[in-house]
Amino acid sequence: MLYYLIALFIIIADQLTKWLVVSHMELGQSIPVIDQVLYITSHRNTGAAWGILAGQMWFFYVITIAVIIGIVYYIQRYAKGQMLLGISLGLMLGGAAGNFIDRAARQEVVDFIHVIIVDYHYPIFNIADSSLCVGVILLFIHMLFDSGKKKEQ
């Protein structure tokens, strides 16, 4: 249940922040948070990261539904007693669902977190994207420790 609450928290935070951006900012408007480093920039993306597969909504619908079903299956089947695995899956579920809601409702994803590292403008992203990335990193860490435990046995 905890893992689904994590996913729900991510979905609510993601959708609330996207609603604030859409409601209070013009497309392309940028607000500095830390000048030359972090901005809130109103952006839309019809594809994946870096605009890959722009406009291929049916592809994203099918893949995302399959991923969500897979994550729910793994939570139900394997997450009991595996806190790190469950948290990682909850984060990925929330992230996948957050961006799916955008694609289904708007046919695009609202992005707004704009990071500049030296002179490189990292692709603008959102809370769902961040949640997916952190979830994948935690899953990788879980897999490293889990495979180490299996080798010891």
From Swiss-Prot:
| Record GO cellular component, one term | plasma membrane
User: Could you say which residues form the signal peptide?
Assistant: none
Record-listed E.C. numbers: 3.4.23.36
Ordered alphabetically, the record's keywords are: Aspartyl protease, Cell membrane, Hydrolase, Membrane, Protease, Transmembrane, Transmembrane helix
* Compartmental location: Cell membrane
Q: Where are the transmembrane segments?
A: 52-72, 81-101, 124-144
**Catalytic site residues?**
111, 129
Q: Give the similarity note.
A: Belongs to the peptidase A8 family.
Which HAMAP family does the entry mention?
LspA (MF_00161)
Q: What protein am I looking at? A: Lipoprotein signal peptidase
Provide the gene name from the record.
lspA
